[in-house]
Amino acid sequence: MNRAIFTILLAFVATASQAQGNNYTIRGTVDDPDVKVVYLEQQAKGYETLDSAIVTNGEFTMKGKVDKPVPAVVINKYRNVLNLFILEPGDITLKYPFSAVGGTLNDSMTYLATEYPRSIDSTLDDEARSKRFEQYAETMYLRHKDDALGLRILDMCFASPTDKLRLYNMGGLMIKEYPSFVSSKEVWAKYEATSEGKKMLDIQSAFDGKRLSDYVGKGKYVLVDFWASWCPPCREEIPGVVAAHEKYKERGLQVLGLIVNDDKKDADKAIEQMGIPYPQIFGITFEQIASYGINGIPHIILFAPDGTILKRGLRGEGIEKALAKIFGE
């Protein structure tokens, strides 16, 4: 055979093989009968709609090509996320809600999210189990720190903004350019600057001039609850905070509420309804609490007598655990 023709044939076969290797087929289910059309969107750089499909009898199919695996979602017309997965070559089965099977990266993510947690020693407490999970997730992330699996792991598997920032800084280009991370890294950095062991940052009310430093750093342990009357999770935490106040107030604990983006009348009504006995600072804004890397409430911080941050992000039983270590049962 003519050598030139042979070379051309080899190139054609290689190209055809590569094209076939980039193909994907997505088969998915939707529980909501009102969803008639679904949309496939990639999330690697900005948000780009790649395809759409009609839902028939709760099922849909999409086919296409992808150059390299990317984070993706299936959404409805209202942009509600129906499934979150990795778009990669191969056959991918999506089951509502949030189940993806097929493809090396999707299967690895499914193992991490569902199978690995079941393998952790069930006799460990929740904190130890969470730590064990995050250790394994970090190991997997470091093997995939510049691909779609690493991106999903960083996005979903770490609670601490300090850990997120540390791992983000170790990531490759896909991680560094992911829009959600780009917008969040400043918040993570502020959280890191006010993490456990760091000194307090002062906050002043524009309403009456009261300051956080009027209470913190004055020789007492101070438990500070950032909350609002319109926030149901905040109200759920209040009984535990009140109980901590009653139990430890004679043993050196000061409890303080910082009321965020709230109407004064609504806040006063909530204070009366829930029988909150400790002082409050009203007129605090989300812009102010962002200096602590807080992007949602409730957020509860325990300060040492010298103003050092001892614990933050306390919730539920964690409040009593932290205080019992200091004051005893």
Please tell me what each predicted stretch does.
Residues 223-224, 255:
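Hydrophobic beta-strand anchors of alpha/beta hydrolase catalytic cores
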Residues 270-276, 283-328:
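Thiol/disulfide oxidoreductase modules built on the thioredoxin-like
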Residues 1-28:
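Bacterial Sec-dependent N-terminal signal peptides
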Residues 43, 80, 95-98, 127-197:
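N-terminal targeting signals for export/organelle localization
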Residues 226-243:
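Conserved redox-active cysteine motifs that mediate thiol-disulfide chemistry
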Residues 20-140:
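A non-transmembrane, solvent-exposed segment enriched in polar/low-complexity residues
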Residues 251-266, 276-286:
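Thiol-based oxidoreductase modules, predominantly thioredoxin-like and allied folds used
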Residues 203-222:
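A short beta-strand-turn-helix
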